[in-house]
Regions:
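Active-site proximal beta-strand in glycosyltransferases
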Residues: 114-116, 129-151, 167, 173-175
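Conserved catalytic-core segment of nucleotide-activated headgroup transferases in glycan assembly
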Residues: 39, 212-215, 223-274, 281, ...
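Acidic donor-binding loop of glycosyltransferase active sites
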Residues: 292-309, 322
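A charged, aromatic-enriched C-terminal amphipathic alpha-helix characteristic of glycosyltransferases
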Residues: 38, 360-399, 432
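N-terminal subdomain of nucleotide-sugar transferases
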Residues: 1-65, 73, 249-253, 427-431
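Short His-centered aromatic/hydrophobic patch
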Residues: 117-123
């Protein structure tokens, strides 16, 4: 996807900050529904509302259906072949593809100010390859959506140690919850020294994934149907089988006046082993239809998790006015501390019956959880933190001494002629000298702007301080 014709950042005389995003694809068959794609799209949209000095170089699998959602003048998509098998992505790193998208030898891509890695397993590969190829080693911000905990993984070679290595190379690493951070630190003690675990502790912090302000409903639907929603993944780590066998089946035995909507339950499972469960509905909708159906539901259920992650399924319901009963655990209390919690399966059955029978209570809880989302869980509330962290990490990059002759000569050359990165580098020093401190000094120099013209990113002299 090409940058639009007009020159990005030129008219504002800004020094544009560039962020290279490394992906973590887990839903290859429909990238529009992939959690990473949705998350980075939200970040781009929300940051664009509060600042106009960021340009995103976004790496995505070579599929066309997601390009349209990133049609912004400050985004460029670089599409490369990508494994469809999740475990293969853990070790996937094609240096020839990286060289192609970074235009190695063309000098048109290398002024990156921050690497935003969503796959910490690949971070060492990135800094090793790009650091040796480039004159420039930018700092790293990581967002880990997943860790290969031993209590979850049933494959032979989990990537937990490589994930921790990637975190250690970052300036900061976001995880979904404080509970998840504690799981990482606890398991890391089995493999690493106390000093290394302390390093992880200093770098990892929770980033509670917000919802889009414009997708939050103004009010609840007070005329709901007797539908219980389980909109989580139907996996063991989401306690799915126990929820069905120990909560939903017993509830159906007691009363047959409700349905359970499980949109992520696949048709193969339904047809082969679920025919006797007449209460199950696995109808799938597009995004608008999904939200519309959530508004009709009486209550949702959020299960025990082995992963202690943030539950987007729960916030999806809450922002549409559907209250959720939640397993009594810290990771749900981080999400919504004022909800109804169950400590065992019998308690879950009791709570579900209360919501099915007492619509007035249900509506009160739905309104409470909706108001909590509006006040605490929207991007309007959270985007300033992300913006601050990006600025802080870039600002803390070491800068070159602007009083030295090398920098003074560099500025004089830019003053005499607007220069591309190739021109800046090729006439000045060899490959052993890194460009990073010079890039930072130019960024901090109010006389210099950096923008995208029709063909290249260029440095331009704008006058005295």
């Amino acid at each position: 996807m090409q940058v639009k014709e007009r020159c990005f950042g030129m008219s504002e005389n800004k020094f544009i900050k560039r962020i290279l995003v490394w992906p973590n694809i887990t839903f290859y068959k429909d990238l529009t529904q992939d959690s990473f794609v949705q998350t980075i799209h939200r970040m781009i949209v929300e940051l664009k509302k509060i600042r106009d000095d960021i340009y995103w170089d976004l790496i995505l699998p070579d599929k066309s259906e997601v390009v349209y959602i990133f049609s912004y003048e400050n985004v460029n998509i670089h599409r490369i072949p990508w494994p469809s098998f999740i475990q293969s992505t853990r070790g996937h790193f094609d240096t020839s593809q990286i060289d192609e998208i970074t235009k190695y030898g063309n000098w048109n891509f290398e002024d990156i100010d921050l690497i935003f890695s969503h796959l910490p397993e690949s971070t060492w590969n990135l800094v090793n390859h790009l650091g040796n190829r480039w004159h420039h080693i930018p700092p790293i911000l990581t967002y880990s959506h997943w860790f290969d905990f031993s209590t979850i993984c049933n494959w032979k070679y989990p990537a937990f140690m490589r994930e921790c290595e990637g975190v250690s190379l970052s300036e900061k690493c976001y995880v979904n919850t404080e509970s998840q951070k504690q799981l990482v630190l606890s398991e890391a003690k089995e493999y690493f020294s106390e000093q290394f675990v302390d390093k992880l502790n200093s770098k990892i912090e929770p980033f509670h994934l917000p919802v889009l302000d414009n997708e939050v409903q103004n009010d609840i639907n007070t005329n709901t149907e007797k539908i219980i929603v389980f909109n989580h993944r139907t996996k063991v780590y989401k306690d799915f089988n126990n929820i069905v066998n120990k909560v939903l089946d017993p509830l159906w035995e007691k009363r047959k006046d409700f349905k359970v909507w499980i949109p992520l339950l696949d048709i193969q499972t339904i047809s082969n082993s679920w025919k006797h469960r007449d209460y199950i509905d696995n109808t799938k909708y597009d995004k608008n239809g999904y939200y519309k159906q959530l508004k009709k539901c009486r209550v949702g259920i959020s299960p025990k998790q082995k992963y202690a992650g943030w539950s987007v399924a729960t916030t999806d319901g809450m922002m549409n006015g559907c209250p959720f009963i939640m397993y009594d655990a810290d990771y749900y209390k981080e999400l919504y501390p004022n909800g109804d919690f169950f400590g065992d399966y019998d308690s879950a059955v009791t709570l579900l019956e209360k919501y099915l029978d007492d619509e007035s209570y249900r509506n009160k809880e739905g309104k409470k959880s909706l108001e909590y989302v509006k006040n605490s869980l929207t991007w309007g509330v959270k985007s300033s933190k992300l913006s601050h962290d990006i600025t802080n990490i870039i600002d803390n990059t070491k800068s070159y001494d602007t009083n030295k002759k090398g920098y003074i000569k560099l500025v004089e050359d830019i003053k005499n002629k607007t220069m591309t990165k190739k021109e800046v580098i090729s006439r000045r020093w060899g490959s052993s000298i890194k460009f990073t401190p010079y890039r930072k000094a130019l960024m901090d120099d109010e006389r210099i702007s950096y923008y995208k013209n029709k063909e290249n990113w260029v440095y331009e002299y704008k006058g005295k301080k």
